Amino acid sequence: MSDNAQLSGLCDRFRGFYPVVIDVETAGFNAKTDALLEIAAITLKMDEQGWLMPDMTLHFHVEPFAGANLQPEALAFNGIDPSNPLRGAVSEYEALHAIFKMVRKGIKDSGCSRAIMVAHNATFDHSFMMAAAERASLKRNPFHPFVTFDTAALSGLALGQTVLSKACLAAGMEFDGEKAHSALYDTERTAVLFCEIVNRWKRLGGWPLPLPTDK
């Protein structure tokens, strides 16, 4: 077995980071003051040949925290009615506690050391998740406090597109605009897109890295 064959595990691929795809829907742009309304998380796994694929999924509608701003423009954009009882919304604590529990198990099972968020325009999703975790006083946050994998940047490099829908189409994937701005759908599409970019780099010979040769 070559040394390169040892690099097919998830723990080897991203320096021990465990990638978790996240998307949020919110009632504005300010993570400190505007409500988190929906969040979805998809973990990733690798098969024995080192191909990346989606694994486990969690999805929650979230109750606005006490005193949260609800910007009408944001609600019109994502079509969410925070007061609709049919949403089955849970607290920020309940949503993130469940997601963090799933992620910590994935970290342990894969031999990774810490989770890293994968998201499209990741700064936005990261800021809202971290602010919600702080409000919920969740101490065991498995995610890196600032490092992310941004599929907008990766798509710009690999596909020449930065908009999620256009990047998916450029990658040969389907994208239903009617389902966009649902956290679950956008997370699923982002997960498949990230896996395609990582796997395409592998197919092109970019991974595993070539072994250094002595001259």
From Swiss-Prot:
The keyword Glycosyltransferase does not apply. Keywords: Exonuclease, Hydrolase, Magnesium, Metal-binding, Nuclease, tRNA processing. This is Ribonuclease T. The active site is at H181. The keyword Protein transport does not apply. It holds the Pfam family RNase_T. It comes from the Bacteria. Binds two Mg(2+) per subunit. The active form of the enzyme binds two Mg(2+) ions in its active site. The first Mg(2+) forms only one salt bridge with the protein. Its EC number is 3.1.13.-. InterPro entries: Exonuclease_RNaseT/DNA_pol3 (IPR013520), RNase_T (IPR005987), RNaseH-like_sf (IPR012337), RNaseH_sf (IPR036397). It comes from Salmonella typhimurium (strain LT2 / SGSC1412 / ATCC 700720). Belongs to the RNase T family. Transmembrane segments: none annotated. SUPFAM superfamilies: Ribonuclease H-like. Homodimer.
